[in-house]
Amino acid sequence: MKNLHYIPHTHWDREWHKTFEAFRVRLCYSMEMMLDTLENDENFSYFMYDAQTSILEDYLTIYPENKDRLKKLVGEKRLFVGPWYTQPDFYLISGESLARNLLIGSNIADDMGHSMEVGYIPDSFGQAAQIPQIMKGFDLKSVYVWRGI
């Protein structure tokens, strides 16, 4: 018998075809729906918020009163955040910036209660040869990649 794992998640572009502020309005709306669902629907056990912590800062700038709600869900491992600060595009940056991105993101996630232990890279248009070395340095035992392989 094979196991099928369904992982509810979102990929979040901080800016893309709209402004940062336009996307932040959507972020706040989706974050509110996600929080309400995790807190009130016993059949919805966890959610992965794109492995980046900058979205927590963006949301908490508008709704700082919800920090404890987020911390509770992250600490219970029902809301997975980090280890990145922002999703990197490996074609545009150096190994040093990748390491610092992970350092900042994992520290923020740890402060919230838990940093996801997967090097989640769903939207990079290329990959760096140093990914295994960098992931090992942050004790990330697995990596999820999508395009650019």
Language-model segments: which ranges?
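Carbohydrate-active enzymes and regulators
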Residues: 1-149
